Amino acid sequence: MNAPSTATELSPARQPDVPVDRRQRQALVVGALTPLLPAHALLWQREDTVPYECDGLTAYRELPLAVALPETEAQLAAVLAACHRLGVPVVARGAGTGLSGGATPHAQGVTLSLAKFNRIVRVDPVSRTAVVQSGVRNAAISEAAARHGLYYAPDPSSKIACTIGGNVAENSGGMHCLKYGLTIHNVLRVRGYTVEGEAVEFGSEALDAAGL
């Protein structure tokens, strides 16, 4: 005997009414994000967003509706959550040195700059590990580790300017990757946020951890 079954009609989750017109959509986004960020941490005027229209892949350019520059994780999470509620795409950006278009803005979205997350939390010479925020420059990690006779191996040609967050996103390498591997082989733990603004962590700082 077959178990009874019921066919039901499924409706898509209701999305907020977001205007299609760019100016109206921009006004809605700016209105939602302004209370979440400090003054001057939200850019939407054309002259302010032009510097963010592309990354190192300059053949493709697009102006975002706005550029958010949060300073704390709470602000970052709030921006992501607000954009998610509005159904607005978010593109994260480090230093914009990538050549694969990973930071190319979405014309109907928000560019989320991580430039202000530029703190080196600690360097542990005993375990030979460092905890840094995503906006720290690649070269700055080696500079901080140099006093302990150490350095961070993945060294893309843009290491003076590129950030570790961008390196993780692009799995950057460099001349030392033949011996020490790519970024993925040198990162033990990553803390990030989902599009809903929820914090997530992957990996562990334990030296015997499998890594990422």
Per-segment meaning from a language model:
Residues 84-86, 93-95, 162, 186:
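Short, basic and Ser/Thr-rich N-terminal targeting/leader segments
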Residues 88-89, 151:
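Residue-level detector of anion-binding/catalytic polar loops
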Residues 79, 86, 141:
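Aromatic/hydrophobic pocket-lining residues that form π-stacking "cages" and hydrophobic walls in ligand
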Residues 119-212:
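FAD-binding subdomain of flavoenzyme oxidoreductases
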